[in-house]
Design a protein with these regions (language model features):
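Canonical positions in the second alpha-helix
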Residues: 210-211, 244-245, 278-279, 312-313, ...
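Long, contiguous interaction/recruitment modules in multidomain scaffold/adaptor proteins
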Residues: 89-222, 236-244, 248
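TPR alpha-solenoid repeat register
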Residues: 221, 255, 289, 322-323, ...
């Protein structure tokens, strides 16, 4: 497994952990999904977009010969030699945008590596990563931004190239192959999440409705669609969408959190309690679900209960956002020293993270 360091050329290729693998659909393409969305007036992007001159240059200077793993290293060195140091940022960019900006999130760097790798003849595709990725709270609901990596070769003779920013050798990462259209749907779901966070809930809903219809086997899409529906004052439809999704994805923890939010929005406390109990049965050790419980308890002003949930989520898997919310819960409970320690830990984990900086400004000087 290759994790994203400051210096691209310093990385090494290792065999990754693969699980729950499915066949990549040969007919799936990211540009076809984009074209279908554009035809409906949706601002969909092709994550693999890369200027032809960049592709021609990498082919000329890296070449198509040599072992695949050696060629992959040459692509990374070529990037560093031509573009210098790349920086992690919370923006989701296409391959071309990441190349020009020299920054982006794990999705952006994966897009760039796959586009360049394919240009030099590498057999490389997306894989979905199940871990604590980017998650954002919006008025008590739970939006999920997808984390992907690249796979060189095919299982079992494969290498995983993962551009996540925080390596953790003690964490089990499960990988599942993705077709290009699936990856493009997740990429555009991330863009729709940003639309929602920026206050454009109606466009986010339209994008997510389209994407979930195109790729119904990706739970993130229907999860985020339900949040958009809720934000657009369509709680009954959001409830129906979530109930159907829970039947199809009974172990996807964010669905329980959002279904609880919608039930409370509709004034159905009994259903919310039932959903919490069901979610606890399947997801008590899932840091995403535990974090969502913390958000609900914080919203109920149960700050001690929220702190317990946020601390458990952070201990299940290191997360700057969980530590930041732990700081918020401690401070709301009047526990200033505990809040100071938690926020300092969050800043140390992700000093440039936009959410952490916003929280730091909100809480003021500690």
């Amino acid at each position: 497994m290759l994790r994203f360091p400051v210096t691209l050329a310093a990385v090494g290729l290792l065999v990754g952990c693969a699980g729950q693998r499915v066949a990549v659909r040969a007919d799936a393409s990211s540009d076809a999904l984009q074209a279908a969305g554009l035809a409906q007036g949706l601002p969909l992007r092709n994550p693999l977009e890369l200027p032809p001159d960049v592709m021609a240059q990498v082919v000329e200077e890296v070449g198509r010969d040599g072992r695949p793993d050696t060629r992959a290293h040459r692509v990374l060195r070529w990037l560093e030699n031509h573009q210098g140091t790349f920086q992690y940022a919370s923006e989701t960019y296409t391959a071309g945008e990441a190349f020009e900006a020299k920054r982006g999130d794990c999705f952006a760097f994966t897009n760039l590596f796959i586009a360049l790798g394919r240009a030099v003849g590498l057999q490389i595709h997306y894989v979905y990563v199940r871990e604590v990725g980017a998650f954002q709270e919006k008025d008590g609901s739970y939006l999920v931004s997808s984390h992907v990596a690249a796979e060189l070769g095919t299982f079992p003779d494969n290498d995983i190239i993962d551009f996540a920013r925080t390596p953790d050798a003690h964490t089990l990462y499960m990988y599942r192959e993705l077709g290009d259209a699936e990856a493009a749907a997740l990429f555009n779901s991330n863009l729709a999440v940003q639309q929602l966070l920026d206050g454009r809930a109606h466009m986010a809903e339209r994008m997510l409705r389209f994407l979930s219809e195109q790729e119904p086997e990706l739970p993130e899409l229907v999860n985020n669609l339900a949040v958009a529906l809720s934000r657009n004052h369509q709680a009954p439809e959001a409830r129906a969408v979530l109930n159907a999704a829970l039947e199809h994805f009974p172990r996807y923890a964010p669905l329980y959190t959002n279904a609880m939010s919608v039930a409370l929005q509709l004034g159905d406390g009994v259903e919310a309690q039932d959903l919490e109990a069901r979610g606890r049965e399947v997801a008590e050790d899932d840091p995403l679900y535990v974090f969502g419980q913390g958000l609900h308890r914080f919203g109920d002003r149960d700050y001690a209960g929220a702190a317990e949930r946020f601390e458990r989520a952070a201990n299940l898997q290191e997360s700057a956002v969980a530590w930041a919310w732990l700081a918020r819960a401690h401070l709301a409970a009047g526990q200033r020293s505990e809040g100071r320690r938690a926020l300092k830990h969050a800043i140390a984990l992700a000093p440039g993270d936009v959410q952490i900086q916003e929280l730091q400004s909100e809480l003021g000087s500690l």
